[in-house]
């Protein structure tokens, strides 16, 4: 497979003029990411009569999340004078799209640049769209960088800069829907690989940069807005939050957000998991499995997904497969087997495909679904474990090294 680094101009993604007025909009309160109650309070604060606030919130919510507008002028059932008032006080601008890459398999990756907060600098994060037959999955980031330093993950080599806000998490979804033509009256880019019918984005996974449960409140707020039936209206059964095992946040996720849960597992004993996923030293497997068994709503209809990266001669033996079955005993679960995706400087190799299939057979025979995830977007560093905002600026030597390890 040849490696493509197509940092093409953003011609494939419709960016309206209003989306680029970022500096001017920075000092204004963004309505994106506010709850309806917070939006009502913001309207009262600028002098909107209290008797009007519920109606105005409904109007704004519809235009922002159903129609997907990013310019108050497009809100056709709001008077021009009221539009001007909103423009003066609020922002609904999108972040800057600093880069877009399109894989040969149709996977798309956007590099989004957010303005500085306080005395900080602008930050960049990556968001990935994975089209499949009948569905389209958007992988969202929750932090800029990560603190967890999982040894097989590229994001773990980028130090944590800061948490993303609810606005910035939601902005990833809004930008992706803009670019894919997933709002009413928008056109899908020519040649784009998307579901033939219905929505272009059917599923959300919090599996991008960062640990979602270390940014719980912002993630919660963003996902509750994304699943609101009067707006973006994504089913909670189609939203999956993935954690490396932040045990205290897991029960809260089920109780307060109610989405599907995925566990970044990758090992069946504490010694190995301490090395692969260092947070295991704080929340070892016994605590993690106990929290899984207590997850609210857990049932055969609401299973936990366990993610297991396949590392050659590290965690891929048939004995490991048998121990995995024992570890998950009694937990309604699905096990995603993930072929390791190489990145510059990684010290691991992907398990041989035949070994992955043998591993899957052991798990399947024990009654667990264990699909092997087909790598998507490897050629643009968009596959699982490959996200890192600095990857858009890889040095030539790193690109050549990546091409060598992908093709070997």
Swiss-Prot record:
What CDD domains does this protein's entry cite? Radical_SAM
Tell me the cofactors it needs: [4Fe-4S] cluster
Q: Where in the cell is it found?
A: Cytoplasm
The record's section on Pfam families has: Radical_SAM, RlmN_N
* Active site as annotated: 126, 384
Provide the E.C. number(s) assigned to this enzyme: 2.1.1.192
Q: Which UniProt keywords apply?
A: 4Fe-4S, Cytoplasm, Disulfide bond, Iron, Iron-sulfur, Metal-binding, Methyltransferase, rRNA processing, S-adenosyl-L-methionine, Transferase, tRNA processing
Q: Which GO terms describe its cellular component?
A: cytoplasm
Which molecular function GO terms apply here? 4 iron, 4 sulfur cluster binding; metal ion binding; rRNA (adenine(2503)-C2-)-methyltransferase activity; rRNA binding; tRNA (adenine(37)-C2)-methyltransferase activity; tRNA binding
Task: Indicate the family of this protein.
Answer: Belongs to the radical SAM superfamily. RlmN family.
PANTHER family referenced in this protein's UniProt entry, alphabetically: 23S RRNA METHYLTRANSFERASE, RADICAL SAM CORE DOMAIN-CONTAINING PROTEIN
Protein's UniProt name: Dual-specificity RNA methyltransferase RlmN
Q: What is the lineage of its organism?
A: Bacteria, Pseudomonadati, Pseudomonadota, Alphaproteobacteria, Hyphomicrobiales
